Amino acid sequence: MHCPFCNAADSKVIDSRLAAEGCQIRRRRECVSCGERFTTFESYEVVMPRVIKSNGKNEPFDEAKLRRSLMHALQKRPVTQEQIETVLSDIQLQIRRLGERDVKSRTIGEIVMQSLFALDHVAYVRFASVYQDFQDVEAFRRQIEQMQQREH
């Protein structure tokens, strides 16, 4: 770690503590050259897998796109912002736990559907109607029947 005072390349760690609810490490350092002390914060970087679209294209995971999809499905539903954030984090965790560099968009869609099913059935059907490209009322009916069978 370069010293912010003299730009020397070497410093020693005097103290380390967890910060930001355990998501960061706060380190107190001392420059070996000039003796000045400074603080650094270290945090981990979460790398999400790339998404393989149904057309075969490969693109980076887009948290904003996932958030928009959830918000659209949950629009005007009795769900708090905290619940939405929890579901969003849970979905991303499930995707990371797959341990793959590339994940099919279909797999992500299935994870989202499972999460919405547990959270709000109306949002689940809304998402399913777009995700599975419902073409008529009968498709809605079949989805609702499947949902009711899962509950019993």
Curated annotation (Swiss-Prot):
InterPro entries: ATP-cone_dom, NrdR-like_N, RNR_NrdR-like. GO terms for biological process: negative regulation of DNA-templated transcription. This is Transcriptional repressor NrdR. It comes from Acinetobacter baumannii (strain ATCC 17978 / DSM 105126 / CIP 53.77 / LMG 1025 / NCDC KC755 / 5377). One of its GO terms (molecular function) is DNA binding. Belongs to the NrdR family. Negatively regulates transcription of bacterial ribonucleotide reductase nrd genes and operons by binding to NrdR-boxes. A zinc finger (unnamed) spans 3-34. Residues 49-139 form the ATP-cone domain. Its cofactor is Zn(2+). Keywords: ATP-binding, DNA-binding, Metal-binding, Nucleotide-binding, Repressor, Transcription, Transcription regulation, Zinc, Zinc-finger. Signal peptide: none annotated. HAMAP family: NrdR. Pfam families: ATP-cone, Zn_ribbon_NrdR. Binds 1 zinc ion. The gene is nrdR.
